[in-house]
Amino acid sequence: MTEITGEMRTAFREQGFLVVPAVLSDEQIAAGRRVVDGLLADQPIADGQVGPHFLWPRFGAAGHPLLDFYREVGVAALAGQLLRSDLAVSDPDFAQVATTIPPWPHRPGGPHVDGLTPCEDDGRPSTFSVLAGVWLTDQGQRHRGNLWVWPGTHLRFGRYLAERGADALRRIDEMNPGPYPKIELGAPTQAVGTAGSVLFAHYLLAHNIGGHDGTADDDRRETIYYRLQASGHRQRWRTVVTDPLIEFRA
């Protein structure tokens, strides 16, 4: 099993994201791409479409190929190395298939936080502990559909909520478009790495989709995202968003 080192955990705590290389074998990458191809056959990309194309398959009682893939890759065990040892990773109930079709020379104007538009039926924000992105295509170069992140913003967002109370997370009218709060962002960077890497990003980290500067003959970007909750997260979400490292080991 791939090991997340103490140095990598420190980088995640400080920066809010981590790219773990060489998690998937070539066979697992190929299997993941076959699953994506099957889903896109049912919900195809339109002829001539460029830019992002998303699918949001939910996992029912009968299971789902993307849940099987999640388990085969060992995403939970890997994410668990970031969490405190007394916390487990709950199985996700849906995934996001994120593709970017070139050419799409887009640059994000700013970041967002997930799960606020809309909130859940009871008004609770759809918070989670960590975003896991399984990279099925190479993202070793910038501007190939890479995720843009603003390092350290998870900590500043946490301070913002600690000062105003956790329910300020729902007051998007007080935030910048995105939505994301009016805090210091710093300079963004693009997450880079090879196919078979797994990206982890803190829930509060500022992020957004980037453009794909390739040609129409280049491969589309393919990532499978899973939004993961540590055990008990739903019950303590207010504590988690005001103390953003409380679920993670040092």
Name every feature range the model reports, one short phrase each.
Residues 119-142, 192-195, 227-230:
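Short, conserved beta-strand element in jelly-roll/cupin
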Residues 139-206:
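Double-stranded beta-helix
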Residues 19-20, 134, 199-201:
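Short hydrophobic-aromatic micro-motifs
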Residues 42-51, 162, 195-250:
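Non-heme Fe(II)/2-oxoglutarate
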Residues 100, 150-157, 227-233:
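Short edge-strand/loop segments of extracellular domains
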Residues 1-14, 21-121:
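Non-heme Fe(II)-dependent double-stranded beta-helix
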Residues 107-116, 167-185, 214-218, 239-242:
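Short, surface-exposed loop/helix-turn segments at secondary-structure junctions
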